[in-house]
Amino acid sequence: MAGKGIADVLFCLDSSTSMEPCFDAVRQHLVSFVEGLKSDGQFEWDLRFDFVSHSTSSFKSGSEIIFRAKSIYEENLFDALYKNKSQENNAKLFTSSISDFVDKLNKLRAGGDETNLIALDTCLDFPLRPGSDCHRVIILLTDEPLETGLEIQEQLEKIPDLITKIHSLGVLLFMIGPDSAGYEELSAANRSTYDVVPKGNGLATVDFKRVLNQIGKSVSASRAQVIRGSVNKALFGQNTWVSSSRTEMRGA
Protein backbone atom coordinates (compact mmCIF):
# COMPACT_ATOMS: atom_id res chain seq x y z
CA MET A 1 0.00 0.00 0.00
CA ALA A 2 1.39 3.40 -0.97
CA GLY A 3 2.41 5.80 1.77
CA LYS A 4 1.87 9.53 1.72
CA GLY A 5 4.71 12.01 1.39
CA ILE A 6 4.53 15.56 2.72
CA ALA A 7 6.53 18.47 1.33
CA ASP A 8 6.67 22.25 1.64
CA VAL A 9 8.40 23.67 -1.43
CA LEU A 10 9.65 27.26 -1.67
CA PHE A 11 11.17 28.86 -4.76
CA CYS A 12 13.62 31.63 -3.86
CA LEU A 13 13.45 33.72 -7.04
CA ASP A 14 15.96 36.39 -7.93
CA SER A 15 13.63 38.93 -9.58
CA SER A 16 16.34 41.23 -10.89
CA THR A 17 16.04 42.66 -14.37
CA SER A 18 17.46 39.74 -16.37
CA MET A 19 15.37 36.95 -14.85
CA GLU A 20 12.19 36.89 -16.99
CA PRO A 21 13.30 33.70 -18.86
CA CYS A 22 13.55 31.88 -15.51
CA PHE A 23 9.98 32.79 -14.56
CA ASP A 24 8.74 31.45 -17.88
CA ALA A 25 10.64 28.18 -17.46
CA VAL A 26 9.40 27.51 -13.92
CA ARG A 27 5.81 28.15 -15.04
CA GLN A 28 6.19 25.71 -17.93
CA HIS A 29 7.95 22.92 -16.09
CA LEU A 30 6.78 22.91 -12.46
CA VAL A 31 4.80 19.78 -13.27
CA SER A 32 8.14 18.06 -13.99
CA PHE A 33 9.05 18.52 -10.33
CA VAL A 34 5.84 16.79 -9.28
CA GLU A 35 6.44 13.99 -11.79
CA GLY A 36 9.90 13.50 -10.31
CA LEU A 37 8.42 13.21 -6.82
CA LYS A 38 6.01 10.52 -7.97
CA SER A 39 8.45 8.66 -10.20
CA ASP A 40 9.00 5.78 -7.78
CA GLY A 41 5.24 5.15 -7.60
CA GLN A 42 5.33 4.57 -3.85
CA PHE A 43 3.81 7.77 -2.54
CA GLU A 44 0.95 10.15 -2.82
CA TRP A 45 2.09 13.64 -1.93
CA ASP A 46 0.61 16.39 0.23
CA LEU A 47 2.33 19.38 -1.38
CA ARG A 48 2.39 23.07 -0.53
CA PHE A 49 4.10 25.62 -2.78
CA ASP A 50 5.12 29.24 -2.42
CA PHE A 51 7.78 31.58 -3.70
CA VAL A 52 9.80 34.53 -2.46
CA SER A 53 10.25 36.92 -5.36
CA HIS A 54 12.84 39.50 -4.36
CA SER A 55 14.77 42.47 -5.71
CA THR A 56 16.87 45.20 -4.15
CA SER A 57 17.71 48.80 -5.05
CA SER A 58 20.25 51.26 -3.68
CA PHE A 59 19.56 54.99 -3.37
CA LYS A 60 21.30 58.11 -2.03
CA SER A 61 24.76 56.82 -2.96
CA GLY A 62 24.14 53.59 -1.09
CA SER A 63 22.90 55.14 2.17
CA GLU A 64 19.42 53.69 1.65
CA ILE A 65 18.67 50.14 0.53
CA ILE A 66 15.17 49.16 -0.54
CA PHE A 67 14.29 45.46 -0.40
CA ARG A 68 11.20 44.19 -2.18
CA ALA A 69 9.83 40.75 -1.43
CA LYS A 70 6.51 39.14 -2.24
CA SER A 71 5.05 35.65 -2.06
CA ILE A 72 2.15 34.03 -3.83
CA TYR A 73 -0.45 35.90 -1.76
CA GLU A 74 1.54 38.52 0.16
CA GLU A 75 2.58 41.74 -1.57
CA ASN A 76 4.30 42.93 1.61
CA LEU A 77 6.01 39.74 2.71
CA PHE A 78 8.14 41.13 5.54
CA ASP A 79 5.09 42.44 7.37
CA ALA A 80 3.30 39.12 6.85
CA LEU A 81 6.17 37.10 8.29
CA TYR A 82 7.45 39.31 11.08
CA LYS A 83 4.85 41.90 12.12
CA ASN A 84 1.46 40.19 11.93
CA LYS A 85 1.37 37.70 14.79
CA SER A 86 -2.12 36.38 14.04
CA GLN A 87 -2.08 32.65 13.35
CA GLU A 88 -4.70 33.08 10.65
CA ASN A 89 -2.17 35.16 8.73
CA ASN A 90 -0.34 31.94 7.90
CA ALA A 91 -3.24 30.97 5.64
CA LYS A 92 -1.93 33.58 3.19
CA LEU A 93 1.29 31.64 2.74
CA PHE A 94 1.52 28.51 0.58
CA THR A 95 -0.92 26.94 -1.85
CA SER A 96 -1.64 23.34 -2.76
CA SER A 97 -2.80 24.39 -6.22
CA ILE A 98 -0.23 24.21 -9.00
CA SER A 99 -2.47 26.27 -11.28
CA ASP A 100 -2.77 29.00 -8.63
CA PHE A 101 1.01 29.02 -8.15
CA VAL A 102 1.60 29.30 -11.90
CA ASP A 103 -1.00 32.05 -12.24
CA LYS A 104 0.67 34.16 -9.54
CA LEU A 105 4.10 33.49 -11.02
CA ASN A 106 2.79 34.74 -14.34
CA LYS A 107 2.16 38.15 -12.78
CA LEU A 108 5.72 38.68 -11.54
CA ARG A 109 7.81 41.37 -13.18
CA ALA A 110 11.59 41.51 -13.03
CA GLY A 111 13.54 44.60 -12.02
CA GLY A 112 16.32 45.80 -9.71
CA ASP A 113 19.33 44.05 -8.22
CA GLU A 114 19.62 41.02 -5.93
CA THR A 115 20.43 40.04 -2.33
CA ASN A 116 19.91 36.30 -2.58
CA LEU A 117 20.94 35.27 0.92
CA ILE A 118 18.62 37.78 2.59
CA ALA A 119 15.84 36.25 0.49
CA LEU A 120 16.98 32.74 1.45
CA ASP A 121 16.83 33.65 5.13
CA THR A 122 13.32 34.97 4.56
CA CYS A 123 12.36 31.62 3.00
CA LEU A 124 13.71 29.85 6.07
CA ASP A 125 11.35 31.91 8.23
CA PHE A 126 8.20 30.67 6.50
CA PRO A 127 5.83 28.56 8.66
CA LEU A 128 7.20 25.25 7.42
CA ARG A 129 5.45 22.17 8.72
CA PRO A 130 7.62 20.89 11.59
CA GLY A 131 6.85 17.17 11.62
CA SER A 132 9.48 14.52 11.02
CA ASP A 133 7.51 13.37 7.97
CA CYS A 134 7.69 16.72 6.12
CA HIS A 135 10.31 17.42 3.46
CA ARG A 136 11.19 21.13 3.66
CA VAL A 137 12.57 22.18 0.26
CA ILE A 138 14.01 25.48 -0.98
CA ILE A 139 14.99 25.95 -4.63
CA LEU A 140 17.15 29.07 -5.10
CA LEU A 141 17.33 30.39 -8.66
CA THR A 142 19.63 33.24 -9.74
CA ASP A 143 21.74 34.25 -12.72
CA GLU A 144 24.20 36.42 -10.74
CA PRO A 145 27.04 35.51 -8.34
CA LEU A 146 26.57 36.60 -4.76
CA GLU A 147 29.59 38.84 -5.19
CA THR A 148 27.96 41.08 -7.84
CA GLY A 149 24.78 41.98 -5.93
CA LEU A 150 24.17 44.41 -3.08
CA GLU A 151 25.03 44.04 0.62
CA ILE A 152 27.77 41.59 -0.34
CA GLN A 153 29.88 41.59 2.82
CA GLU A 154 26.91 41.36 5.15
CA GLN A 155 25.62 38.33 3.27
CA LEU A 156 29.02 36.61 3.21
CA GLU A 157 29.38 37.06 6.97
CA LYS A 158 26.04 35.34 7.60
CA ILE A 159 26.78 32.16 5.65
CA PRO A 160 27.83 30.13 8.74
CA ASP A 161 24.64 31.19 10.53
CA LEU A 162 22.55 30.31 7.48
CA ILE A 163 24.12 26.84 7.34
CA THR A 164 23.31 26.31 11.02
CA LYS A 165 19.73 27.41 10.39
CA ILE A 166 19.37 25.12 7.37
CA HIS A 167 20.59 22.20 9.48
CA SER A 168 18.24 23.02 12.38
CA LEU A 169 15.24 23.17 10.06
CA GLY A 170 16.20 20.02 8.16
CA VAL A 171 15.92 21.89 4.85
CA LEU A 172 16.88 20.45 1.48
CA LEU A 173 18.50 23.35 -0.41
CA PHE A 174 18.90 23.25 -4.18
CA MET A 175 20.79 26.16 -5.75
CA ILE A 176 20.96 26.87 -9.48
CA GLY A 177 23.24 29.80 -10.24
CA PRO A 178 26.57 30.94 -11.71
CA ASP A 179 30.00 30.29 -10.25
CA SER A 180 30.31 32.07 -6.90
CA ALA A 181 32.58 31.54 -3.91
CA GLY A 182 29.70 32.53 -1.63
CA TYR A 183 27.28 29.98 -3.06
CA GLU A 184 30.02 27.36 -2.97
CA GLU A 185 30.54 28.02 0.74
CA LEU A 186 26.80 27.82 1.38
CA SER A 187 26.60 24.49 -0.46
CA ALA A 188 28.56 22.93 2.42
CA ALA A 189 25.22 22.70 4.23
CA ASN A 190 24.12 19.10 4.65
CA ARG A 191 21.85 17.78 1.89
CA SER A 192 22.44 20.84 -0.30
CA THR A 193 23.25 20.84 -4.01
CA TYR A 194 24.66 23.62 -6.18
CA ASP A 195 24.38 23.44 -9.96
CA VAL A 196 26.73 25.95 -11.61
CA VAL A 197 25.29 27.54 -14.77
CA PRO A 198 26.27 30.44 -17.07
CA LYS A 199 25.99 33.95 -15.67
CA GLY A 200 23.62 36.74 -16.61
CA ASN A 201 21.11 35.31 -19.10
CA GLY A 202 18.13 34.70 -16.84
CA LEU A 203 19.02 30.98 -16.70
CA ALA A 204 17.84 30.75 -20.31
CA THR A 205 20.25 27.89 -21.06
CA VAL A 206 19.05 25.71 -18.17
CA ASP A 207 16.95 22.66 -19.06
CA PHE A 208 14.33 23.27 -16.38
CA LYS A 209 12.26 20.25 -17.34
CA ARG A 210 15.21 17.99 -16.55
CA VAL A 211 16.45 19.98 -13.54
CA LEU A 212 13.09 20.22 -11.78
CA ASN A 213 12.35 16.56 -12.48
CA GLN A 214 15.71 15.59 -10.96
CA ILE A 215 15.09 17.76 -7.90
CA GLY A 216 11.72 16.04 -7.45
CA LYS A 217 13.40 12.64 -7.60
CA SER A 218 16.02 13.75 -5.07
CA VAL A 219 13.34 14.91 -2.64
CA SER A 220 11.42 11.66 -3.08
CA ALA A 221 14.54 9.63 -2.30
CA SER A 222 15.51 11.71 0.74
CA ARG A 223 14.59 11.13 4.36
CA ALA A 224 12.51 13.87 5.99
CA GLN A 225 13.97 15.31 9.18
CA VAL A 226 12.48 16.83 12.30
CA ILE A 227 13.17 20.47 13.20
CA ARG A 228 15.83 20.49 15.92
CA GLY A 229 15.84 23.07 18.70
CA SER A 230 15.09 26.77 18.49
CA VAL A 231 15.81 28.67 15.29
CA ASN A 232 16.88 32.30 15.08
CA LYS A 233 14.64 34.29 12.76
CA ALA A 234 15.55 37.29 10.61
CA LEU A 235 19.33 36.87 10.66
CA PHE A 236 19.69 40.13 8.73
CA GLY A 237 17.34 42.05 11.04
CA GLN A 238 14.57 42.20 8.46
CA ASN A 239 11.99 41.95 11.25
CA THR A 240 12.98 45.49 12.32
CA TRP A 241 13.05 47.21 8.93
CA VAL A 242 10.71 50.11 8.31
CA SER A 243 8.07 49.16 5.78
CA SER A 244 6.60 51.38 3.12
CA SER A 245 3.93 49.86 0.93
CA ARG A 246 5.66 47.02 -0.97
CA THR A 247 9.20 47.89 0.07
CA GLU A 248 11.37 47.47 3.14
CA MET A 249 13.87 50.27 3.76
CA ARG A 250 16.82 50.60 6.06
CA GLY A 251 19.84 52.82 6.17
CA ALA A 252 23.17 51.29 5.21
Regions found by a protein language model. Name each.
Residues 1-252:
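Divalent cation-coordinating acidic motifs and surrounding scaffolds
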